[in-house]
Design a protein with these regions (language model features):
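Short, conserved phosphate/pyrophosphate- and ester-handling motifs at nucleotide-, phospho-/glycolipid
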Residues: 57, 202, 267
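Conserved N-terminal subdomain of the carbohydrate kinase-like
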Residues: 22, 34-36, 44, 59-148
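Short beta->alpha connector loops
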Residues: 72-73, 155-159, 179-184
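Conserved phosphate/ATP/ADP-binding segment of small-molecule kinases
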Residues: 165, 169-250
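Gly/Ala-rich phosphate-binding loop of Rossmann-like dinucleotide-binding domains
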Residues: 58, 169, 279
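Structural motif
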Residues: 13-15, 148-149, 174, 198
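Conserved phosphate-binding/catalytic region of the ribokinase-like
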Residues: 2-14, 38, 185, 217-302
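Glycine-rich phosphate/adenosyl-contacting loop at the front of the ribokinase-like
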Residues: 1-69, 74-88, 253, 259-260, ...
Length: 302
C-alpha cells in the first residue's frame, strides 16, 4: 500500500519512540566469515528500530509519528528530510545542538547478518527530553494522557524504560515493545509485567531475558508469560512464530519460505505489520499470518 502524501499532516495513530538514525549496510552476494574481505554493495538509508517500525506502519496505511532525537547537523537535517519525503511525521522530533545524529553499521551476506555496530549514544544522552510532546500538550498531557498505540524500542536506556513503565503518561497507552538487539534485551525487564504491554522478541532475546536456552519460540513465549508478561510474540527466523498471553491465548504460525535478500529491519517489519493487522481488526492466528506475509515480502525484496 502506497502512503498518501498528506498522511504526515494528520493526527498520528501510533507513536514510534526510539532510534532514528542512518543505516550504513554492506551486502555481499556470498557467504562470509570473520576476516573476509569481499566485493559487494554499500548503501545508506534511514534506519533505527523506531524508524523501521514507523516506515512499515506507514506502508500499512497507519499514521506514525516519530519521537526521537536528531543532531542539528547536516546528517540530522538530511535524515529529517528523508523521513518527511517518505511521509513520516517528524513534527515531534527533539533537535539537539550538543549531540550528533546516531548511526548504525552492518555487514550482511548470503548467510545472514555477519556483524553490526549501533551508535545510539545521542538517543541515550537525550533521555526523557524526547518524551516532552506527551506532557506539554503537543500530543498529550498529564491530565489527558495518550490513549493510542506506542512502539517503544530497546535503544532507550534502562532508566528511561523504567520511568516509562511507572509513568502515568503511558498508563492508558497500548504499548508495543521490542529490544533493539539481543545485547539490549534485558532493558525490557521493567515493562515485562506492564498491564498494557505487548513484548516482541526473538528466541535468542527471550533466552537472554529469562537466562534460559529455548529450543523453540513456543517454549520461550510460554516461559515469558509465566514470568509475568501480559502478552508476548516470539519469532525464530524461518521456524514457527508463537504468541502467548496471560489470559491463556496461544497461537503458532510458520513463516512463508522465501529467498532472503536482507535481514536488517525484519523484526521491526514483523512488529509493525502485526500492529497494523490488529488495527484493522485481525486477531490471533490471522494477525500473525498477515505479519509473517508482510515480513516475507520485506526480506525477499532487495
Amino acid at each position: 500500500m502506497s502512503p498518501r502524501p498528506d498522511i504526515a499532516r494528520q493526527r498520528p495513530d501510533i507513536l514510534c519512540i526510539g532510534s532514528v538514525l542512518w543505516d550504513v549496510i554492506g551486502r555481499a552476494p556470498r557467504r562470509m566469515a570473520l576476516g573476509h574481505d569481499v566485493p559487494g554493495r554499500i548503501t545508506r538509508l534511514p534506519g533505527g528500530v523506531a524508524m523501521n517500525i514507523a516506515a512499515a506502519c506507514l506502508r500499512e496505511g497507519m499514521r506514525p509519528a516519530l519521537l526521537t532525537v536528531l543532531g542539528r547537523d547536516s546528517e540530522g537535517r538530511a535524515l529529517a528530510d528523508a523521513c518527511a519525503a517518505m511521509g513520516l511525521n517528524t513534527d515531534h522530533v527533539t533537535w539537539a545542538d550538543d549531540l550528533p545524529t546516531d548511526r548504525y553499521m552492518a555487514i550482511e551476506a548470503e548467510n545472514g547478518l555477519v556483524a553490526a555496530v549501533a551508535d545510539a549514544h545521542s538517543l541515550e544522552a537525550a533521555g526523557d527530553r524526547i518524551l516532552a510532546p506527551l506532557s506539554d500538550g503537543a500530543l498529550a498531557r498529564a491530565d489527558r494522557p495518550w490513549t493510542g498505540r506506542v512502539a517503544l524500542d530497546g535503544n532507550l536506556t534502562l532508566a528511561l524504560l523504567e520511568q516509562i513503565a511507572a509513568s502515568p503518561l503511558f498508563a492508558t497507552a497500548d504499548l508495543r515493545v521490542a529490544p533493539a538487539s539481543p545485547g539490549k534485551a534485558g532493558r525490557l525487564l521493567p515493562l515485562l509485567g506492564h498491564a498494557r504491554a505487548t513484548i516482541y522478541v526473538n528466541r535468542v532475546e527471550a533466552g537472554l531475558i529469562c537466562e534460559t536456552l529455548f529450543d523453540s519460540a513456543e517454549a520461550a513465549a510460554r516461559e515469558l508469560v509465566d514470568r509475568g508478561a501480559r502478552r508476548v510474540l516470539v519469532t525464530d527466523g524461518s521456524a514457527p512464530v508463537a504468541e502467548a498471553a496471560a489470559d491463556g491465548a496461544f497461537h503458532v504460525a510458520r513463516p512463508p519460505t522465501v529467498s532472503v535478500c536482507r535481514v536488517t529491519g525484519a523484526g521491526d517489519t514483523f512488529m509493525a505489520s502485526h500492529i497494523a493487522a490488529e488495527a484493522r481488526g485481525e486477531q490471533g492466528a490471522a494477525a500473525l499470518e498477515e505479519a509473517l506475509a508482510a515480513t516475507a515480502l520485506y526480506v525477499s525484496s532487495a
